[in-house]
């Protein structure tokens, strides 16, 4: 498992399996989520032997910034990131008077096939792990030197088509020991996968759910959003 996808409890179990005390997990969590370490070598309060075990068993991967476009009007920044496997995703940083909002991706490509969206032109390549989704936020916080206050899951991909990883991400990003962004400051946008919406509702999260309609009737919506035929 990607180490950034681990909850604090999972990290404690991993540390114990490597012969380390559970408190090491909190140190690791702090380095990844607060100090935004880019490598294990930066984690100087961990022993060299432990760092070597981590490198061997849980390679620490980070997003690579390929390009940034910044608006001269309001300072909005659009990032192009390269993942560890060479695939690329986009994220957006938006600065407002009430705080900093980010729009993040949940997949490489998309298989929903909405005719107005370029994200699905080549279909879905793969889904992002919870840690990769989280890493978009961690990178932009480190790059800006400022904290994110609002999250919108409205970038590339259909979040509910990556249900398990997105759900885990929501728990990670709102974890009190992590970057602790309140769930009421998180919005998830979906094209309307009805059964996953019902599953999400049963989780009793405090996030905002936005359903993209894009049409006033079923006939028009089906002509531009194939998902409407499956979930009219």
Language model features with spans:
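Conserved alpha-helical substructure of the radical SAM core
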Residues: 121-150
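Conserved AdoMet/S-adenosylmethionine-binding subsite of the radical SAM
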Residues: 141-150, 155-232
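Canonical Radical SAM [4Fe-4S] cluster-binding loop centered on the CxxxCxxC motif
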Residues: 95-132
């Amino acid at each position: 498992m990607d180490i950034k996808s681990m909850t604090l409890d999972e990290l404690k179990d991993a540390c114990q399996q490597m012969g380390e005390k559970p408190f090491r997990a909190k140190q690791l969590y702090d380095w990844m989520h607060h100090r935004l370490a880019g490598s294990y070598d930066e984690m100087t309060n961990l022993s060299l032997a432990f760092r070597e075990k981590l490198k061997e068993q849980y390679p620490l991967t980070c997003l690579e910034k390929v390009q940034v476009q910044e608006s001269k009007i309001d300072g909005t920044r659009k990032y192009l990131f390269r993942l560890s496997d060479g695939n690329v995703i986009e994220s957006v940083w938006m600065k407002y008077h009430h705080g900093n909002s980010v729009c993040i991706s949940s997949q490489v490509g998309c298989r929903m096939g909405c005719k107005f969206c370029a994200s699905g032109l080549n279909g879905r390549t793969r889904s992002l792990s919870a840690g990769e989704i989280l890493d978009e936020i961690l990178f932009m916080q480190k790059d800006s030197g400022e904290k994110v206050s609002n999250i919108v899951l409205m970038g590339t991909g259909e979040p509910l088509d990556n249900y398990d990883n997105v759900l885990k991400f929501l728990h990670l990003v709102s974890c009190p020991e992590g970057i602790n962004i309140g769930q009421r400051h998180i919005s998830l946008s979906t094209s309307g996968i009805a059964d996953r919406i019902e599953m999400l509702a049963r989780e009793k999260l405090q996030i905002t759910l936005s359903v993209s309609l894009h049409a006033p009737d079923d006939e028009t919506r089906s002509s531009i959003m194939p998902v409407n035929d499956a979930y009219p």
